[in-house]
Design a protein with these regions (language model features):
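Residue-level detector of short, conserved catalytic/binding motifs and their immediate flanks
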Residues: 10-12, 34, 76, 87-89, ...
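Conserved NTP-binding catalytic cores of kinases and kinase-like/nucleotidyltransferase enzymes
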Residues: 1-53, 57
Length: 208
């Protein structure tokens, strides 16, 4: 993440040439996309700046609350170009996959993204979204995203916002239990990044 880039221990995003199960579950968990999350943290909630217990605690809290999916992790020692870089969390990343976030062929996965403005990024904005934020597409893949599907997702999110801000019929669009669990997890953890970037929303079928 961007904050982590300024810390002594850098996080890394891994993009493999072919799918692999790096954590060692089974073939169903194979993926090209993985993350190496740093142990150190700049989060002021944590008293010990040497140990990022917030990340590990977050995964534990989400599993305890019964989230449909929480990234699987494993501690790993990282050596890069012959140099030892320290202890990391090897973690699954957020993506459409049967063993991650499975929205099916007709669903979508988007991110409330502070870096929507990056060159080549496909994005859209809604009326009530803060000016510094934009929604970017994670699934369908932006490279194959049709204009019709893009417009349908945009229209759907406008309807979601309208229902929320008019206090009428929001339950037709959002899963209250899922939203409540998400808020509770951030309250328990004292997260200072709630509703910032790295917030993902998904729908399993755009037609329903």
């Amino acid at each position: 993440n961007t904050t982590g880039a300024y810390l002594p221990q850098k996080p890394y995003k891994l993009k493999l040439s072919k799918k692999a199960d790096l954590i060692g579950f089974d073939a169903d968990f194979k993926s090209k996309d993985w993350a190496l999350l740093s142990i150190c943290t700049g989060n002021q909630v944590m008293k010990n700046q040497e140990c990022n217990l917030l990340t590990l605690g977050g995964f534990t809290v989400c599993r305890a609350l019964g989230f449909p999916w929480t990234p699987r992790t494993e501690f790993v020692n990282v050596v890069l170009n012959g140099q030892y870089r320290g202890l990391y969390y090897l973690a699954e990343t957020v993506e459409q996959a049967e063993k991650r976030i499975d929205v099916g062929a007709d669903g979508f996965l988007i991110e409330n993204d502070a870096y929507w403005w990056k060159e080549g990024e496909q994005y859209f904005k809604t009326e009530h979204l803060p000016y510094m934020m934009g929604y970017t597409f994670k699934y369908p893949d932006p490279d194959v995203l049709t204009e019709d599907t893009k417009n349908a997702i945009h229209e759907y999110m406008n309807s979601v916002e309208s229902a929320i801000f008019s206090h009428s019929g929001a339950n037709r669009y959002i899963d209250y239990e899922s939203f409540a669990k998400w808020l509770l997890a951030h309250d328990i953890l004292g997260s200072d990044d709630v509703a910032g970037s790295n917030m993902f929303l998904y729908k399993e079928s755009l037609g329903n």
